[in-house]
Amino acid sequence: MTDFKLGIVRLGRVAGKTKYTLIDEQDIPLVESYSFEARMEVDADGNGAKIFAYAFDKNRGRGSGRLLHELLWERHRGGVAPGFQVVHLNAVTVDNRLDNLQLVPWGWRPKAEETSSKQREQSLYWLAIQQLPTDPIEEQFPVLNVTRYYNANGDVVEEEENSCTYYECHYPPCTVIEKQLREFNICGRCQVARYCGSQCQQKDWPAHKKHCRERKRPFQHELEPER
């Protein structure tokens, strides 16, 4: 296999973890003129959520935000015609290498083939993210690890009973995200990190234990019924 370079861009925290995006070497200079962040898009029909990378032109401000994969497609392949969309072939929605992008008609669905855990662990995204050190911001400023909460429209809301909070597996390379609210197992010690299964939780423990702090739940008084 010929050696090649990739860019790994930090997007910030969303869905309970720090997210990164992969880009081709030729697109690395974009970091000079764009800022990047992760955003969650919640399916209005209740079919879970997806996380995408957004790019913001530094000269135009926050109003210039757009999906990174669409920006890259237009730079290298041309405009997206009405009735078409750009999708990620491997279903990893932050793997924005050009080889992983494809233009398809709206309504297109990939083959219903379940990606085995073995295939997932051998994917380029998995291998790349697995090599990253622990996020220094998580290690030095754990108080800043605030999870964003989203409603059904994908808008950030305060923590409240009717908010829809989807989590992605806390193990950095894993991109499995909850299809239903509170679906994943939660770390019994900190009550924050969530995992798609015991295997990912075990793999994440060497890094997670450095800033996993036992959470003391406040005692809640039950309200007496009105008479």
UniProtKB/Swiss-Prot annotation:
GO terms of molecular function: zinc ion binding
Main subcellular location of this protein, as a coarse class: cytoplasm
Keywords attached to this entry: Cell membrane, Cytoplasm, Membrane, Metal-binding, Zinc, Zinc-finger
Zinc finger (MYND-type): 174-212
Binding site for Zn(2+): C187, C190, H208, C212
Keyword Nucleotide-binding: no
GO cellular component, one term: membrane
Keyword Metal-binding: yes
Gene3D superfamilies: 6.10.140.2220
Family annotation (Pfam families): HNH_3, zf-MYND
InterPro entries xrefs: His-Me_finger_sf, HNH_nuc, ZMYND19, Znf_MYND
Cellular compartments annotated: Cytoplasm; Cell membrane
UniProt xrefs under SUPFAM superfamilies: His-Me finger endonucleases, HIT/MYND zinc finger-like
Domain of life: Eukaryota
Stated role: May be involved as a regulatory molecule in GPR24/MCH-R1 signaling.
Binding partners and assembly: Interacts with GPR24/MCH-R1.
Record-given protein name: Zinc finger MYND domain-containing protein 19
Gene responsible for this protein: ZMYND19
